[in-house]
Structures are given as C-alpha cells and as structure tokens.
C-alpha cells in the first residue's frame, strides 16, 4: 500500500437546484472525482464533499411556476443531481443539502456570531439586482446596463438588509493572497480578483434579504433570510462539524480544506467573500481554490429552445460512463473553455478509446491466447526496442505526478494514453505475428507479450482515477489486479505464468456516426418539446411563440427626438472577443461605405464566428464610448426573451449594407 500522506479534504461547489445539470455542470463532479481517486491512490486520506445549494429567490420563483412548494421543488432537483453524480461514478464521501437541519441551525449561529462581534450590521440597500445571480450591483458596475456576471437584465431594488463589513478585512486578504501564491489558481483568476475587485476597494456586502422568504431565517430578525452566499459557502464547514459553540473532532481533522474546486464564474465568491467570512470566524483559509473553465456546446450556448443541451445521462446511454468521463477530462484545457459536440465525442471515442486503448488490450490478450494458450511468461529474451518501451512506461507515473500536482488533469490523462500509444508502436516494432511463424523466436515472442501485458497493467493502474470501470475491466482480462501507486515506476512485477482470460471483451467498439444521429435527433426533439411545455406553464398556457413580455413604460419622446436617431443596416465583416471582458464582442461593421467598430454585450449568445457575415440593425449615431477599454461607435439592436437570451435584429429580406431603417 502507498504510504499514508495524511488528510486531503476537497469540495466541489454545491450545485444550484434550479434545474437538471447539463454536461458542462457535470464536468466539475467528474473532474473532482478524478482528483479524489488520484489522491487516494497516492496515499492520502481523502474526504470528498459535494451537494446542492437549495435556497434563493430564483428557486422560489421556479417552484411557484411549477405549482409546488420550494422544498418539493428542491427535493426533486437535488435528487436528480445526486442521480447524475452517481451515474458518472463519482466517489464522494458526503452529499450535502443546504436544507439539511444541521446546516440551517449552524448558519443561524454563524450569522448571530458575526452580528454580535460587529462584523454584520443593519442598514438598507438600494441598487440593481440580478435575480439569476442573486447579486446586487451599483450602476457603475453594470456592463451595458446589465449584470456584469451573466449579462442579463437587472432590476432596481431597495430593501432593508444586513451587511457584512468586507472592507474591514480587505487589506488582510490582499496580504494573504500575495504571500500564498497557490491560494487562487490558475494565476489568471488571481489577477482578475486582485485587479477587478480587491485593489479598487471592497464595498460592504448585503447578507440578508426580505423580498422573498425561501431561505434560512435570521434568528433574531425572522423577516430576513440569510443571503444565499453566506448560506451556501458555509456548507464547507457546517457539514464537517463546525459549530461556533464547539466543533467536532472531524472538523478539527479536516479543516482547512485542501482544495475547493469550482467554476470560474464563482471564483469571486470563493476567493473574496468566503475567506473574509473565515477570517471573521477566526478560522484558517482553504489551501487552494481552483477555478476551472467551462465546457461549451460547440461554439454555441447550450439552450433547450435550440435542443442542443447535452446531458450526462444521454451521453452515458450512447457511449457509456467511462467514455463520458474520458471526453470531458481529456478535452478541457487548464484555463480556457473546452468544446463539446456529438461529433467530437464520437471522433474521440473512436480514435482514442476504440483504436488506441481497446484495440491494444484486445490484440494483446488475443495473441497470448493464440500463441501460448493464454499463459504469459517472461523468458528474458530481450530486443533492442524493449529498453525504450520500459523507459517510457516506468517514467509515466512521475510525469503524471507532476501534472496532477498542478491539477492539469487533461495533461495527466494524455500521459496515460501516450503510454498506450507506445505499446501499440511496440507491437509494430516487434511484429509478433512474424515471430510466431519461427519456432526459434518463440521465447522472444513470449517476452514481447509479457512486456505488453506488464505495460498495460501499469497503464491501467494509472488510468484508474480517470476511467475506473475501464481500468478494472482491463486488469480483470489480464487476470491481475490494479498495481499499488508506489510500484508503478517498476517494470516486471506481473506474475510469471499468469493465464489471461480466454474470452477477451471488446472494451470500446467503434461507433458509426450515422447510427448515432437518429438518437441525437430524438434527444434534441424531446428537449424542444419539453422547452415548449415549460414555457407554456410559465406563460399561463401560452407557448413560447405566443407569450408576451410586458415592460414598464419609459418617458415619452417627441418625433423630433426620434428623428435624431439614425438607424441603418450593417454587415459584420469581422468579430472578436474583448480580452478584458467575459460578455463583450467587438465587431467591425460595414455601414454603406463606412466601417464602424461596435462593442456589444452579446458574447453569451453569439460566438465571434457566428457574427461574421450577418446583416444587422445598427444605431449609427450613438456617441462613441469605451467599453472595457475598447472604443464603440454604435449599437447593435437586439431583442431579449424572458430568459435573458439575446437575438440580433436582422432584416427579413435581403437589403444592402447602409440601407436606412425607418
């Protein structure tokens, strides 16, 4: 067994229970599970916690639309989340729910403690509120008048609230981040937090709400419910035994957390709010917060209305659990967003899982049965190419250790497949089928098959954290077991004389895209049908196309005011993402004989590639202004639906660039 290296407490963000998680949401639990399994193999005593975040205004509104209570709603969604987490073979130790009685009780105590010691005070809040993000913003923080996080519409809000004195701890947090370079990873996330939030100065944080009731009541002022982030973030301590009145031995053993694994969109909450809450509670900070990138559906936003959402259970039905795990782990870069499409999944399945891995195992076991009745023996008859094979195989473990220490999981799994590629090359170099024709080469053939079997055993053991079912199937076919981590840099431990299975199983049979496509079409059609039903329920029996949106009327303008605005048709020549923004695209728009640069907050709904060539409606004579440091010389006209999805306004018929809109 690997030497016990002590505890390793890791968490995912708890999933918000507003709906069924898609594959982009599921990526996080698969990534976390791979890390947890790897750490266990290394010899750590891992405690892996995940769960669901179940309070907030958005959930209350969704429950009302569904005609059920918020608790019934979150019970359904939390159950669905847990089902999917289990489906993808995640080995968590604790699945938490923020509606659990012990959590709610502890949150009340935490709020009271912070209030009693003067870190929380009562006041009132007036600002702009984003319901999906459950966040307040000042006018200056908005981007194009919309939420800087999600790009949706915000609403003015004023209410009595309790506030946390963030500024009291800001300098201390800045010092901590500067002296603990691994605290926020990747480094780009750290720079974003420092430059965009901490260094400009923190405002006090609203930590209670009165405009809705679905939350944990403030004990001493029950018309207030605890703000969702103070509620949700504290699960990392409440569910392992923290108590302001005296914590358990488990808490003392596990805290501080070794790793919070979260999506890049909630880094701010985990690296600013959370550490400041912990400082106020006089608790140590987590050792590392890692903000992983997103998994996007092609170049497009996942949307049920488009039928392009990919769910983990659909992927598992079509490709299997480990193929699903392999794709999301292998295709996600360290910092940049990854891309998933059905075609890419099929391509990766066939090239890597079927050709490289499945074919290797099947050929090796089949040749052992064909030439030696399945008995694998080391004869010591070596060849020139053996040394290089052994060097590659025995060096792989340490290369993986290096990658995993930096949480470069995609690179680590690529190292395992580099080992399998080397094995396939070894088959081509040694040509066992040729050796089998020469009785004098029988011992050499036996050694070749032993080397392959030993290499595959090591590779399967290294693969186990990432594809556990596949790794176990491989060693079962080789009639052995997974190798101890400390032994994975040694060659020759496969027991001499072992008999492999005489009925090798095809691990991954190649997939014909033409056979899969009808199933994908059915999935997409079902999504669109479900979307229409949901919209009909939300819109009082109307379909999405029949639904209407009422807006509060704005101040009337005169005809003269209107004629001051110049609207024309433009053609987008080129488009690129604005480097300093997650929401903005910068387009070069041809309007007649003029080209204008226009910055728009539509990145969540359009990719730069989608924009090129579109005919759009443009407000041409808008006063130029800089957005995220980039000059914008006009405005593209869009419509926004009830879900905040933007659609560019385009002419119905073909009209030339520069045509007047009147």
PLM segments and residue spans:
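A glycine-rich helix N-cap at a beta->alpha junction
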Residues: 78-93
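Phosphate-backbone binding interfaces of nucleic-acid-interacting proteins
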Residues: 541-662
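Helix-rich, typically C-terminal accessory recognition domains appended to large enzymatic cores
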Residues: 122, 331, 343-382, 392-500, ...
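Intrinsic disorder at enzyme termini
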Residues: 474-561
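Structured secondary-structure scaffolds
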Residues: 2-50, 102-106, 150, 156-370, ...
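Cys/His-rich short segments
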Residues: 117-170, 174
């Amino acid at each position: 067994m690997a030497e016990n290296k002590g505890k390793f407490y890791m968490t995912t963000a708890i999933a918000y229970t507003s709906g069924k998680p898609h594959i982009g949401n599921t990526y996080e639990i698969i990534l976390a599970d791979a890390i947890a399994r790897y750490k266990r193999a290394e010899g750590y005593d891992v405690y892996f916690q995940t769960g669901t975040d179940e309070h907030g205004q958005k959930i209350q509104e969704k429950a009302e639309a569904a005609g059920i209570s918020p608790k019934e709603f979150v019970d359904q969604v939390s159950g669905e989340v847990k089902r999917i987490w289990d489906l993808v073979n995640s080995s968590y130790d604790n699945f938490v729910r923020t509606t659990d009685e012990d959590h709610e009780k502890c949150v009340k105590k935490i709020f009271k403690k912070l209030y009693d010691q003067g870190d929380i005070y009562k006041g009132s809040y007036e600002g702009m509120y984003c319901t999906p993000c459950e966040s307040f913003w000042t006018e200056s923080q908005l981007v194009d008048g919309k939420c800087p996080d999600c790009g949706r519409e915000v609403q003015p809000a004023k209410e009595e609230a309790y506030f946390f004195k963030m500024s009291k701890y800001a300098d201390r947090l800045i010092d901590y981040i500067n002296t603990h370079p691994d605290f926020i990873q990747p480094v780009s996330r750290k720079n974003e937090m420092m430059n965009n939030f901490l260094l400009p100065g923190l405002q006090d944080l609203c930590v209670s709400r009165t405009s809705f009731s679905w939350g944990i009541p403030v004990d001493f002022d029950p018309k207030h419910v605890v703000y969702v982030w103070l509620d949700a973030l504290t699960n990392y301590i409440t569910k392992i035994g923290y108590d302001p009145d005296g914590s358990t031995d488990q808490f003392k053993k596990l805290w501080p957390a070794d790793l919070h694994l979260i999506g890049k969109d909630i880094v701010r909450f985990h690296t600013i709010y959370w550490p400041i809450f912990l400082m106020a509670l006089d608790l140590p900070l987590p050792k590392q917060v890692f903000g992983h990138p997103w998994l996007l559906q092609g170049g497009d936003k996942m949307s049920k209305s488009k039928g392009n959402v990919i769910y983990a259970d659909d992927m598992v039905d079509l490709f299997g659990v480990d193929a699903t795990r392999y794709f999301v782990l292998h295709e996600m870069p360290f910092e940049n967003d990854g891309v998933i499409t059905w075609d890419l999944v099929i391509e990766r399945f066939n090239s890597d899982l079927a050709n490289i891995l499945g074919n290797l195992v099947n050929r090796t076991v089949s040749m052992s049965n064909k030439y030696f009745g399945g008995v694998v023996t080391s004869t010591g008859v070596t060849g020139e190419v053996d040394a290089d094979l052994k060097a590659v195989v025995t060096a792989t473990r340490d290369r993986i250790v290096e990658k995993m220490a930096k949480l470069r999981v995609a690179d680590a799994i690529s190292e395992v497949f580099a080992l399998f590629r080397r094995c396939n090359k070894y088959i081509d170099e040694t040509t066992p089928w040729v050796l089998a024709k020469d009785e004098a080469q029988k011992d050499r053939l036996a050694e070749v098959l032993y080397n392959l079997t030993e290499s595959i055993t090591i590779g399967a053991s290294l693969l186990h954290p990432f594809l556990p079912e596949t790794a176990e199937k491989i060693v079962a076919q080789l009639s052995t077991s997974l190798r101890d981590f400390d032994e994975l840099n040694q060659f020759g431990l496969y027991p001499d004389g072992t008999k492999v299975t005489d009925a090798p199983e095809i691990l991954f049979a190649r997939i014909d895209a033409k056979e899969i496509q009808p199933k994908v079409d059915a999935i997409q059609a079902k999504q669109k049908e479900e979307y229409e039903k949901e919209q009909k329920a939300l819109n009082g029996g109307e379909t999405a196309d029949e639904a209407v949106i009422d807006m509060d009327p704005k101040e009337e303008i005169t005809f003269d005011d209107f004629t001051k605005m110049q609207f024309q048709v433009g053609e987008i020549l080129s488009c690129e993402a604005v480097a300093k923004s997650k929401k903005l695209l910068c387009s070069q728009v041809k309007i007649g004989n003029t080209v204008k640069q226009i910055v728009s907050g539509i990145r969540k709904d359009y990719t730069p590639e989608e924009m090129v060539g579109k005919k759009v409606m443009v407000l041409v004579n808008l006063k130029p202004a800089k957005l995220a440091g980039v000059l914008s010389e006009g405005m593209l006209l869009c419509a926004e639906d009830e879900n905040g999805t933007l659609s560019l306004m385009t002419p119905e018929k073909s009209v030339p660039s520069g045509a007047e809109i009147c």
